[in-house]
Amino acid sequence: MAQSTTYSRVLGTGSYLPPNRVSNQDLAARLAKQGIETSDEWIVARTGIHARHFAEPDVTTSDLALIASQRAIEAADVDPQAIDLIIVATSTPDFVFPSTACLLQNKLGIKNNGAAFDVQAVCSGFAYAVATADSFIRSGQHRTALVVGAETFSRILDFNDRTTCVLFGDGAGAVVLQASDEPGVLASALHADGSHSNILCTPGNVNGGIVQGSAFLHMDGQAVFKLAVNVLEKVAVEALQKADLQPEQIDWLIPHQANIRIMQSTCRKLGLPQERMVVTVHEHGNTSAASIPLALDVAVRDGRIQRGHNVLIEGVGGGFTWGASVIRY
C-alpha cells in the first residue's frame, strides 16, 4: 500500500496595519522641517509608493503580530490550542530576547508548550518561515503552524536620509498552515550570499548598554536593485521547477512589496501579465517580512485568490537572502 504524502495547507490568512497612515505629502512635510527636500512625485516615480503606516511609539511588533494572528486563526477556524508551532519572521523584534514568537504565544493564550521561535531573513523572512514550517509539518514533527511576518521598521529609519526613510512601513501578516492530504505548499527554494551583507543592513550594535555604530537602516539602493532583479527570477524558476509547474500555470504572483520597478521586472521575466501580480506597495510601502503575508491576505479577502489557485510568493532581503514558495491555496 502506497504511503500518502503529507502537505502543509493554508487554512486561513490575516493581516494588520497600524491606523496611522502616512502619505508621501505627510512625509515630505516632516522632512521639510529638517531642511530635507522630497515630494510625492519623487517618491512615486522611483518606488510606486504613495503611503505607508507607522505604529505608535508604545506599539510593538508583537502587538501587530497579535492582531494579524487572531484574524488568521479566525479565518482558519482552528482552536488556538491546536497550534503547536509558531514562527515569526521579523528584523524588528520587541527585544533581543525572548523571541517575538514566544511573546506572541503568550499573548494568544496558547498553553500547549508548542515550539515558538523567530526567523531573521529581513525581507525574505516570510518565505524562509513558510519553508521552515512546511518542512516541520511534512516531517510529522508538528501539525498546525502559525507563520507570521511582522515589522516596526519605522523604529530603525533615519529620517535624515530621504533615500531610505520614504520606503518602509510597519505592519503584520499571518497564515495558519496545517497538515493535509491535499496539496498546499508545493515547493520552496531558499538561498543566501553573505558577501553582500553590507548593501542592506543596520551596522550598529549594542555593547555594554551603548549603541556602537549606526542603529539605523543603511542601503545601497543601486546594488540592491541590481541583485534583486537577478535572484528573484532565478529563485522563482527554481521553485516552479521543484513544483513541476510552468510560469503560465501560476494564477497569482506575490513578490516582496519593495519597489514597483523590481516587482514589474520579475513579472515580465516570468512572462506573466502584470494583472496576475498582487500589488500593495503603493499603500503599504516596504513592510519587510510582513509584505508578502499582508498582500496575500488582501488578495484572499477581496476574492482574487480562490481555493485551488497556484500562488507564487518570493522575497529578497538583507543578508543577502532570497527565497520563494509555490502554494496551492
Curated annotation (Swiss-Prot):
Which keywords, in A-to-Z order, does the entry hold?
Answer: Acyltransferase, Cytoplasm, Fatty acid biosynthesis, Fatty acid metabolism, Lipid biosynthesis, Lipid metabolism, Multifunctional enzyme, Transferase
Q: Which enzyme type, at the first EC level?
A: transferase
Q: Which GO terms describe its molecular function?
A: 3-oxoacyl-[acyl-carrier-protein] synthase activity; beta-ketoacyl-acyl-carrier-protein synthase III activity
Gene Ontology cellular component list:
cytoplasm
A Pfam family (short name) is ACP_syn_III_C
Q: Where is the signal peptide?
A: none
Keyword Acyltransferase tagged: yes
Q: In which pathway does it act?
A: Lipid metabolism; fatty acid biosynthesis
Question: Which InterPro entries has this protein been placed in?
Answer: ACP_syn_III_C, ACP_syn_III_N, FabH, Thiolase-like
Q: Does the keyword Transmembrane helix apply?
A: no
Q: Name one GO biological process term.
A: fatty acid biosynthetic process
Write down the EC number. 2.3.1.180
Q: Where is this region: ACP-binding?
A: 257-261
What catalytic activity is recorded? malonyl-[ACP] + acetyl-CoA + H(+) = 3-oxobutanoyl-[ACP] + CO2 + CoA
Q: Which domain of life is it from?
A: Bacteria
The active site annotation covers: 123, 256, 286
Major subcellular location class: cytoplasm
Q: Describe the family membership recorded for this protein in Swiss-Prot or TrEMBL.
A: Belongs to the thiolase-like superfamily. FabH family.
Domain comment in the entry: The last Arg residue of the ACP-binding site is essential for the weak association between ACP/AcpP and FabH.
Complexes and interactors: Homodimer.
What exactly does this protein do?
Catalyzes the condensation reaction of fatty acid synthesis by the addition to an acyl acceptor of two carbons from malonyl-ACP. Catalyzes the first condensation reaction which initiates fatty acid synthesis and may therefore play a role in governing the total rate of fatty acid production. Possesses both acetoacetyl-ACP synthase and acetyl transacylase activities. Its substrate specificity determines the biosynthesis of branched-chain and/or straight-chain of fatty acids.
Protein name (database record): Beta-ketoacyl-[acyl-carrier-protein] synthase III
